[in-house]
Amino acid sequence: MAIQANMTVGRRKEAVARVRLVPGTGNITINGRSMDEYFGRETSKMILVEPLKLVDQMGKLDVFVNAAGGGLSGQAGAIRHGISRALVELNPEYRPVLKKAGFMTRDARAVERKKYGRPGARKRFQFSKR
């Protein structure tokens, strides 16, 4: 039975990643560029391949990603979320392993909004006693 290509969406902060997994040689393409070309930081690259390594699919699947919004760190997290969802669609047996590692859960942390009467979300203006 041939493995079908499947599309999934991953999100983190303001970033959205549309991920497509295809049987192949392990190439990861993000917005038409290679992973090494797109991400300068080694930690971002490590974040991407974590789910593939966990289920031993590294080098067996090609990953095509369209990432938009947010910064590079948020996009890396969104891509990891998308890859995890795609792997579960590919093989439902991967779900418990990926869920235990925390890759199936959408990271809900986001920037706290700025409040009025303050310079930021939590910071206060300088207090003068006299």
From Swiss-Prot:
<keyword id="KW-0689">Ribosomal protein</keyword>
<dbReference type="GO" id="GO:0022627">
    <property type="term" value="C:cytosolic small ribosomal subunit"/>
</dbReference>
<protein>
    <recommendedName>
        <fullName>Small ribosomal subunit protein uS9</fullName>
    </recommendedName>
</protein>
<keyword id="KW-0687">Ribonucleoprotein</keyword>
<dbReference type="GO" id="GO:0006412">
    <property type="term" value="P:translation"/>
</dbReference>
<dbReference type="InterPro" id="IPR020568">
    <property type="entry name" value="Ribosomal_Su5_D2-typ_SF"/>
</dbReference>
<dbReference type="GO" id="GO:0003723">
    <property type="term" value="F:RNA binding"/>
</dbReference>
<comment type="similarity">
    <text>Belongs to the universal ribosomal protein uS9 family.</text>
</comment>
<dbReference type="InterPro" id="IPR023035">
    <property type="entry name" value="Ribosomal_uS9_bac/plastid"/>
</dbReference>
<dbReference type="InterPro" id="IPR020574">
    <property type="entry name" value="Ribosomal_uS9_CS"/>
</dbReference>
<dbReference type="GO" id="GO:0003735">
    <property type="term" value="F:structural constituent of ribosome"/>
</dbReference>
<dbReference type="Pfam" id="PF00380">
    <property type="entry name" value="Ribosomal_S9"/>
</dbReference>
<dbReference type="InterPro" id="IPR014721">
    <property type="entry name" value="Ribsml_uS5_D2-typ_fold_subgr"/>
</dbReference>
<dbReference type="InterPro" id="IPR000754">
    <property type="entry name" value="Ribosomal_uS9"/>
</dbReference>
